[in-house]
Regions:
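Extracytoplasmic low-complexity, Pro/Thr/Ser/Ala/Gly-rich segments
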Residues: 27-96
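Short, Lys/Arg-rich N-terminal segment immediately upstream of the first membrane anchor
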Residues: 1-9
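Ser/Thr-rich low-complexity repeats and stalk/linker segments
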Residues: 135-177
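Acidic surface patches and DE-rich sequence motifs
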Residues: 55, 68-72, 83, 118-119, ...
């Protein structure tokens, strides 16, 4: 039979563990929410004509934002977060039924593809090679590719290139956090 001191110690240990888990969860979700809010705000900027992207770099995450300045809303079409857990995509405008999420770090992601990514008139497929290469292609042929073998696209950037429907590389505006 446990003593009163042992029982009290166990209860305190469980309570401290719960409080720590809650604090860590709130910190992580708050960090993601703050980044999303900032990038959503930045996504309303007017950029040069063409389907371009913006990179936002944080201490633990990188956000890549796809734009279509010819869209009536002049807003972002889609967004991809790259962090230690992999890739997370989300439509910035709530009217877009768009989003995808890959668990596991990108270099170790299982080979294969995920279909059914849609942004109103846009739809796409995401591919993983299993060797660190991730590629997202929209229905018109445009998209992005992350490949550790690619040279850095910009100072502080990732090994990522953005391409148009004709395969040509697209410019990328860089916005540091």
């Amino acid at each position: 039979m446990r003593s009163k001191a042992e029982t009290t110690a166990r209860i305190l240990t469980v309570m401290i563990g719960c409080v720590l888990a809650l604090a860590i969860g709130m910190w992580v979700s708050g960090d993601v929410g703050a980044m999303r809010d900032k990038v959503e705000k930045d996504a309303r900027r007017v950029l040069p004509d063409g389907f371009v992207c913006q990179s936002s770099e944080g201490s633990r995450m990188k956000a890549l934002v796809f734009y279509d300045p010819n869209d009536p809303d002049n807003g972002a079409k889609a967004m991809v977060y790259v962090d230690r857990t992999g890739l997370y995509g989300d439509g910035l405008d709530r009217k877009f039924a768009f989003g995808w999420f890959f668990r596991g770090s990108t270099p170790n992601a299982a080979p294969g593809k995920v279909e059914g990514l849609t942004v109103e008139g846009y739809s796409g497929v995401a591919y993983f090679s299993g060797t660190g290469v991730a590629r997202i292609e929209m229905a018109d042929g445009s998209g992005m590719e992350h490949d550790p073998a690619l040279p850095l696209a910009w100072v502080g950037g990732e090994n990522t290139r953005f391409f148009g429907a004709d395969g040509s590389e697209l410019p990328c505006a860089v916005h540091p956090f």
